[in-house]
Amino acid sequence: MDSGAGGRRCPEAALLILGPPRMEHLRHSPGPGGQRLLLPSMLLALLLLLAPSPGHATRVVYKVPEEQPPNTLIGSLAADYGFPDVGHLYKLEVGAPYLRVDGKTGDIFTTETSIDREGLRECQNQLPGDPCILEFEVSITDLVQNGSPRLLEGQIEVQDINDNTPNFASPVITLAIPENTNIGSLFPIPLASDRDAGPNGVASYELQAGPEAQELFGLQVAEDQEEKQPQLIVMGNLDRERWDSYDLTIKVQDGGSPPRASSALLRVTVLDTNDNAPKFERPSYEAELSENSPIGHSVIQVKANDSDQGANAEIEYTFHQAPEVVRRLLRLDRNTGLITVQGPVDREDLSTLRFSVLAKDRGTNPKSARAQVVVTVKDMNDNAPTIEIRGIGLVTHQDGMANISEDVAEETAVALVQVSDRDEGENAAVTCVVAGDVPFQLRQASETGSDSKKKYFLQTTTPLDYEKVKDYTIEIVAVDSGNPPLSSTNSLKVQVVDVNDNAPVFTQSVTEVAFPENNKPGEVIAEITASDADSGSNAELVYSLEPEPAAKGLFTISPETGEIQVKTSLDREQRESYELKVVAADRGSPSLQGTATVLVNVLDCNDNDPKFMLSGYNFSVMENMPALSPVGMVTVIDGDKGENAQVQLSVEQDNGDFVIQNGTGTILSSLSFDREQQSTYTFQLKAVDGGVPPRSAYVGVTINVLDENDNAPYITAPSNTSHKLLTPQTRLGETVSQVAAEDFDSGVNAELIYSIAGGNPYGLFQIGSHSGAITLEKEIERRHHGLHRLVVKVSDRGKPPRYGTALVHLYVNETLANRTLLETLLGHSLDTPLDIDIAGDPEYERSKQRGNILFGVVAGVVAVALLIALAVLVRYCRQREAKSGYQAGKKETKDLYAPKPSGKASKGNKSKGKKSKSPKPVKPVEDEDEAGLQKSLKFNLMSDAPGDSPRIHLPLNYPPGSPDLGRHYRSNSPLPSIQLQPQSPSASKKHQVVQDLPPANTFVGTGDTTSTGSEQYSDYSYRTNPPKYPSKQVGQPFQLSTPQPLPHPYHGAIWTEVWE
């Protein structure tokens, strides 16, 4: 095909178009004596129908011989691609300086820079047989439809011509051959090299010898790994003494047409006998080497063996026919055969190192062997992606900047971005993105690109607006998939060109001006300004005024500054406000305008009270908040303006507990709330404006304090020092003790959970998590006898929860005959850490034995003392009865000693004055003979206050021989039953409960006449209550049946009430 530009078509050029649908189109120019190959018209029409649509990415491949003269036509894109000859703009994006493109026809020509296949950088490190490819890109813009440019990718396959002569590395080649060499032995001759490829490379070798060597030597060419290896074959017996060297000529010729040839002198030196040649362990070696390996890194070690001895077996290793690049990068140890790195290895420059290693012995006539070594260079992620940004279509770039009008359509291409990575595999898989929040995105320009080389269109995503953003700095980031990944960035500045698309905009669409009445004419009311986001004349503004009918003739405006003046005096009583319309027009073409409204309010006097937004405020806050914490916020408004609307807030009817911030209306507390002390606060807020005279308003505020879990549960029963007898006959599931506790918090913070935290090694007992009732879960065995100390934990459900701990002593035995032992066990329990179970403790058992001995001694002393005390008491009581004239069985109705709990005891053990949970006392019994009863029992009369009823206190220390007081009262006294209430636990140290009566005389129960206490019966039960004044305690209570404890928060000594 002839060029319309005067160029000539490359005779051997061939076209291959790649794209959907895929097809191949070949054209051949007529050669000497041949005719041009023409396609049938039907096939041509079919190709036009099947040509790839403009929206698809297309690749075109041309095959061109190297060294073509300038202006040689390679191909016509318009004809080959199916575009019309007019209406399109063709632009060469990639391919200079070897190619040029006609902008109208799309014809591709060669340039003054000749395409030399051997000189192209892309083809210098190719493996034999690989094609030499020169890539180019052409953008095609439809000037008629003014659409986005299309990118056409193409390749020039540069075909080799025979322009290089094959040559040997040296004009003289020397071979040393021992004299005892067997006939048929082969000796390799160094290869000749030819820079051409394929058929134009080395094709044949020819040996030329003189008469003396013609019968001794021959040439044999072996095909080895796509190369022809010339070998000298020994055809006769050699005699060094007869002839020690021969000069031969070896000729090499390529396969070009016409062929090229050269020759070299082959000098054969005959050596003395060394009959064994070295032999490599393997005929060939393969190794992998990571690029950028350090100097001295071991690559591979070749090893050969020689059956000779002495110097003939000493092997020396050398490179054989190794290219210069191998000798520069690798080092071969002559003695060990170890190959190490001696230069920087870069896979991107050379991916495979192929060479031979010669092993030669040190004999007089050295023998040698050759092994092939192939080193594959492994890729390392040592190359960051490269990003190239250039213009596309009608958008040109200069100094890294592109100009584009703000009214362009969406998805307009601004630039062509090419991203590539010199690595391979995952290290070359590049991901490219636009960084930052900019209205631009990357769209893939070609679907045929590899992972290591991709092209994108940088296009807009939304309409551009000069008034919002005048320029963009687009940063493009490319990251490969290596480990660790490498990245690079490049940026493009896009300058947005302004068009008059914005109307003037006022600072405020509505401006309200307060202007006093009785003003002077000509005074300035306000200055109204507008702005235009455009630039130049598009932003020059002119102001005008369009007042409402009522304001016509009263106001005027400056066209240049927008200053509004009043022309006459205003009178508020005639009109309170005026509405003015201000127009601002720019000087663009066509002109755009904007409007604003000015409301002129005539000022008035202070005639409005402040007003709270609500008629009353109710806030809820958590207790224990730190002082100066906000508890609520109020809002107050004033219908006036200026100082008349400046409101000051203050707290009324308050003790300094609260303050208020005038700026925010926030109410702050000056104390930390405690709900248990006070749950509600009420006060008033006062608002006063700044008018003259001032106006004020009031509002009520209520603060409700919400509960926080700041109180731990406290144990009301039993005492830590109390105990209970548990006989082996106790039934399973029977309640053996009851733990009671209280919590001064509320809600879930006061919901209690009971659990046994320790002291239950045998699993005999279980506690109700909600009831606190301890029940027997296993049958009592002999090994279970003794004192069991249960550590009961009582926790609430607060977050975080709080807890209290109680000790429950259960004495498993048949009887309580040995009280001294029990008291010793209890003392040991109180001195034992809670994490030790006293039940089954060997040390504890030994203390029991020691207690038994001590009990025996004490029991004897107590028995004697009891007998003496009983005799004295009986005699004394009889004398008292005779003197008082007491008559048994007579009932008195007078209330002698009505118990009243003291004020201090009722407060319990809470330091913050929380509510007491003590039980209410039962109505007391009246007795007529007050003096007789007091003298008979030796009670100490104590009174809480002048108005309190007298209270009877039992003596705290009884002699060991004290009589059975229950039997004495039953037979000789008309007193009602006496109840002793078990003492509740104390928050301090250890607590003891006074046992006032001997074990044999103790009655346990609620006053039932059938209840038993040891061997005796009594009509009277007892109950202990805390006294107002503390006393010393010396005893411990015990019970034979299930107790019914009455919880009480008081601590101290026991006081007894006489009730009926």
UniProtKB/Swiss-Prot annotation:
Residues 1-57 form the signal peptide. Residues 874-1060 are cytoplasmic. Residues 907-920 have a biased composition (Basic residues). GO terms for biological process: cell adhesion; cell-cell signaling; homophilic cell adhesion via plasma membrane adhesion molecules; nervous system development. Glycans are attached at N305, N403, N618, N662, N813, N818. Highly expressed in the brain and neuro-glial cells. The modification Phosphoserine is found at S918, S949, S962, S984. One of its GO terms (molecular function) is calcium ion binding. Residues 1003-1024, 1033-1043 have a biased composition (Polar residues). Residues 884-1045 are annotated as: Disordered. InterPro entries: Cadherin-like_dom, Cadherin-like_sf, Cadherin_CS, Cadherin_N, Protocadherin, Protocadherin/Cadherin-CA. Residues 58-168, 169-280, 281-387, 396-506, 507-612, 613-715, 718-844 form the Cadherin domain. Residues 58-852 are extracellular. Residues 884-897 have a biased composition (Basic and acidic residues). The chain crosses the membrane at residues 853-873. One of its GO terms (cellular component) is intracellular membrane-bounded organelle. Keywords: Calcium, Cell adhesion, Cell junction, Cell membrane, Glycoprotein, Membrane, Phosphoprotein, Repeat, Signal, Transmembrane, Transmembrane helix. CDD domains: Cadherin_repeat. This is Protocadherin-1. It comes from Homo sapiens. The lineage of its organism: Eukaryota, Metazoa, Chordata, Craniata, Vertebrata.
